[in-house]
C-alpha cells in the first residue's frame, strides 16, 4: 500500500509540474504506457493469488483512474492556455487572395487497406459482415468469455456510455468481435465472415488512437483445426505484402475468446524508417488469432462437439503504416490535404488479387 501511495504522489506531482503537452505526454507514458509504472503494477495482478488480487486489484484500479483523471484535467488546462496564447498572437490577413479550389480527391490509406484485405479474403470465400458501433455489455464482453473484473471492463480501457434509468449499459465497442457473436446467433454453420469496422479504446499516442480500424475474421465449420488457421493467415500475409517468401511463427498468447490463442509474427528488416516484410532476421507481431473458445460457441448456440472454428483480428491502421511507410497514426485523422495527396490512392482503382492490390 505504501508503494501505491508513493507512486500516486510522485505521479500527481509530475503531472502538476508538466509545463506543456509534450511533458505531460511523457508523464503519461512513464506511468500509464505499456512499460509504465502503473501498468507494470496492473500486469503483476495476473501473477498474484486470488486473495492478493482481491486486495490489490481495487487499489490499483483506483490508482490508475486517479492518475488518468489528473492527466486529463492537466491536459485541458494546458490546451486552453496554448489556445489563449495562440489567439493573442495570430491574426487573419483579410487581404490574402482566396485559396485555389479543391483538386481530385484521394482514397485514404485506411480505406485502401480495407479494400485490399477484403479482396484477399474474398478470394478465399469470406463475405463481409458489419454491426453497430454502440454495443451492450453482453455482446462486447460476456458472450466473448470476458470474466467479471477483467481489465478491459474498466473505464480506463473502455468508453462507457451513460445509461438511462433501467436501461442496459452501453459501450463503444472495443473490437469488432460482437459482429461475430451476432452472426453465429443468426446464421447456422458453415460460417466464413470478414468483419471490418471502427473500434474504440481509451488510448492516444503515436501508435494508438481512441478510435481505430480493425478487421476480424471468423470461420465455423466441422473439422476446423489450427492448421487451417495457419494456412489461411500465411497465405494472407504473402498476398497482402506481395512477397512470395515470408517466414512466420505463431507464439502462444492469451485471449479470453480463443483457446488455444496465438500472435502471428513475421520476419522483417529495417532501413531507417523503411520496413521490408519477408527479409531480415527481426520478428514483428502483426495480428492475433486462435481457435474459437468452446464457451463462446455455447453462448452463441453452437455445439463445440460438432462445429469448431478459428478467429483472427488485425489493426488496419497499423497494417497501413507497415505497408506504406507512415510513421505516425495521428495524421490519419487530421484531414491534412497535403498528407492525403502524399499517402492517398486513386479512387478509380479497385484492388484485386488477380489484378494487383496497390
UniProtKB/Swiss-Prot annotation:
Its EC number is 6.1.1.20. Transmembrane segments: none annotated. GO terms for molecular function: ATP binding; magnesium ion binding; phenylalanine-tRNA ligase activity; tRNA binding. One of its GO terms (biological process) is phenylalanyl-tRNA aminoacylation. Binds 2 magnesium ions per tetramer. Keywords: Aminoacyl-tRNA synthetase, ATP-binding, Cytoplasm, Ligase, Magnesium, Metal-binding, Nucleotide-binding, Protein biosynthesis. It is found in: Cytoplasm. Gene3D superfamilies: Bira Bifunctional Protein, Domain 2. PROSITE patterns: AA_TRNA_LIGASE_II (PS50862). It catalyses: tRNA(Phe) + L-phenylalanine + ATP = L-phenylalanyl-tRNA(Phe) + AMP + diphosphate + H(+). GO terms for cellular component: cytoplasm. Mg(2+) binds at residue 259. It is an enzyme of class 6 (ligase). The keyword Nucleotide-binding applies. Its main location: cytoplasm. SUPFAM superfamilies: Class II aaRS and biotin synthetases, tRNA-binding arm. InterPro entries: aa-tRNA-synth_II, aa-tRNA-synth_II/BPL/LPL, Phe-tRNA-synth_IIc_asu, Phe-tRNA_ligase_II_N, Phe_tRNA_ligase_alpha1_bac, Phenylalanyl-tRNA_Synthase, tRNA-bd_arm. It holds the Pfam family Phe_tRNA-synt_N. Its cofactor is Mg(2+). Tetramer of two alpha and two beta subunits. Belongs to the class-II aminoacyl-tRNA synthetase family. Phe-tRNA synthetase alpha subunit type 1 subfamily. This is Phenylalanine--tRNA ligase alpha subunit. It comes from Hyphomonas neptunium (strain ATCC 15444).
Amino acid at each position: 500500500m505504501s508503494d501505491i501511495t508513493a507512486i500516486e504522489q510522485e505521479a500527481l506531482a509530475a503531472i502538476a509540474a508538466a509545463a506543456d503537452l509534450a511533458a505531460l505526454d511523457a508523464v503519461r507514458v512513464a506511468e500509464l504506457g505499456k512499460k509504465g509504472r502503473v501498468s507494470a503494477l496492473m500486469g503483476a495482478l495476473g501473477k498474484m493469488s486470488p486473495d492478493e488480487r482481491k486486495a490489490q486489484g481495487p487499489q490499483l484500479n483506483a490508482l490508475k483512474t486517479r492518475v488518468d483523471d489528473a492527466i486529463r484535467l492537466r491536459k485541458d488546462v494546458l490546451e486552453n492556455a496554448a489556445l489563449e496564447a495562440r489567439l493573442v498572437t495570430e491574426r487573419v490577413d483579410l487581404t490574402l487572395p482566396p485559396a485555389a479550389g479543391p483538386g481530385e480527391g484521394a482514397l485514404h490509406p485506411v480505406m485502401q487497406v480495407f479494400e485490399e484485405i477484403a479482396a484477399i479474403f474474398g478470394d478465399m470465400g469470406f463475405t463481409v459482415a458489419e454491426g453497430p458501433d454502440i454495443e451492450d455489455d453482453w455482446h462486447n464482453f460476456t458472450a466473448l468469455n470476458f470474466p467479471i473484473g477483467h481489465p478491459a471492463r474498466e473505464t480506463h480501457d473502455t468508453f462507457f456510455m451513460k445509461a438511462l434509468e433501467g436501461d442496459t449499459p452501453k459501450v463503444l465497442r472495443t473490437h469488432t468481435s460482437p459482429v461475430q457473436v451476432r452472426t453465429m446467433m443468426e446464421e447456422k454453420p458453415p460460417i466464413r465472415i470478414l468483419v471490418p469496422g471502427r473500434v474504440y479504446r481509451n488510448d492516444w499516442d503515436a501508435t494508438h488512437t481512441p478510435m481505430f480500424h480493425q478487421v476480424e475474421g471468423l470461420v465455423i465449420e466441422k473439422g476446423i483445426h489450427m492448421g487451417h488457421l495457419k494456412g489461411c493467415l500465411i497465405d494472407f500475409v504473402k498476398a497482402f505484402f506481395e512477397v512470395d517468401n515470408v517466414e512466420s511463427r505463431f507464439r502462444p498468447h492469451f485471449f479470453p475468446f480463443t483457446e488455444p490463442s496465438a500472435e502471428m509474427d513475421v520476419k522483417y528488416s529495417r532501413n531507417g524508417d523503411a520496413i521490408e516484410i519477408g527479409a531480415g532476421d527481426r520478428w514483428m507481431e502483426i495480428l492475433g488469432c486462435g481457435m474459437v473458445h468452446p464457451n463462446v460457441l455455447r453462448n452463441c448456440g453452437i455445439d463445440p462437439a460438432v462445429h469448431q472454428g478459428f478467429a483472427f483480428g488485425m489493426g488496419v491502421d497499423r497494417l497501413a503504416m507497415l505497408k506504406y511507410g507512415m510513421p505516425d497514426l495521428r495524421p490519419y485523422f487530421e484531414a491534412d490535404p497535403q498528407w492525403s495527396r502524399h499517402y492517398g490512392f486513386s479512387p478509380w482503382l479497385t484492388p484485386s488479387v488477380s489484378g494487383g492490390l496497390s
